[in-house]
């Protein structure tokens, strides 16, 4: 089965939604599921469940490309000599520690979450709840100075605590970046360091989630399914590059409250539409 023009447009739109919402703390999975309620892909439910996760690989690639110098643990002086960047290695060990809680909980409860919590009402409630949290936390932080200003300042204990907050993002509508940023802000991490650690944490977390979904689905793709994945990931990559640049520039001068208000408004709209 070949993709028709309308289906290609749907995939492009979903890629745009993924690229925008993956890095802003507004829940990419929640937005993808909501969009699917109105613009449904003509694919099996099993494929769509996998697609909504694996499309994140495009967004991951954008982070790797943009933060390569910070992420790559080696620095080459010349063709035959390289220097190990100890701070980068240390940071990756901290990221690994932060990944453990969500990896365990994701494997244990993936089927339950997919079966019971992927609903518009759950998404709406989580959008509103975490929107309120963003506003409350940012108002509280006006009178406080961050105790952890840079990535290098993040301790193993802080990394683990951020990882525990990431578990909350398994509930659709929460937002992986939203949960980790809220957790980081609560324990005294600066906005910029919180966002950067979230980007680092996204790489193994989303690679692991994508691999898990691919293994569950199997690798027996039709040509249409494979094309859907490629288009979705390519669009998500391109859009993510611009969104990451915007977010890092934005949070240097502004707080996250605007995203909190957006979440609240969207959550209320979803509840109203669902009730009609």
UniProtKB/Swiss-Prot annotation:
Keyword terms, alphabetized: Antibiotic resistance, Cell membrane, Cell shape, Cell wall biogenesis/degradation, Hydrolase, Membrane, Peptidoglycan synthesis, Plasmid, Transmembrane, Transmembrane helix
Signal peptide: none
Subcellular location field: Cell membrane
Record carries keyword Cell wall biogenesis/degradation: yes
GO cellular component: plasma membrane
Stated induction or repression of this protein's expression: Transcription is activated by the regulatory protein BcrR in the presence of bacitracin.
Chief location of this protein within or outside the cell: membrane
Biological processes annotated in GO: cell wall organization; peptidoglycan biosynthetic process; regulation of cell shape; response to antibiotic
Reactions that this protein is recorded to catalyse: di-trans,octa-cis-undecaprenyl diphosphate + H2O = di-trans,octa-cis-undecaprenyl phosphate + phosphate + H(+)
GO terms for MF: undecaprenyl-diphosphatase activity
Transmembrane parts of this sequence: 6-26, 49-69, 89-109, 117-137, 151-171, 181-201, 224-244, 256-276
Membrane topology type: Multi-pass membrane protein
InterPro entries referenced in this protein's UniProt entry, alphabetically: UppP
Superkingdom of the source species: Bacteria
Stored PANTHER family: UNDECAPRENYL-DIPHOSPHATASE
Miscellaneous information on this protein: Bacitracin is thought to be involved in the inhibition of peptidoglycan synthesis by sequestering undecaprenyl diphosphate, thereby reducing the pool of lipid carrier available.
Record function comment: Catalyzes the dephosphorylation of undecaprenyl diphosphate (UPP). Confers resistance to bacitracin.
UniProt-recorded name of the protein: Undecaprenyl-diphosphatase
Taxon lineage: Bacteria, Bacillati, Bacillota, Bacilli, Lactobacillales
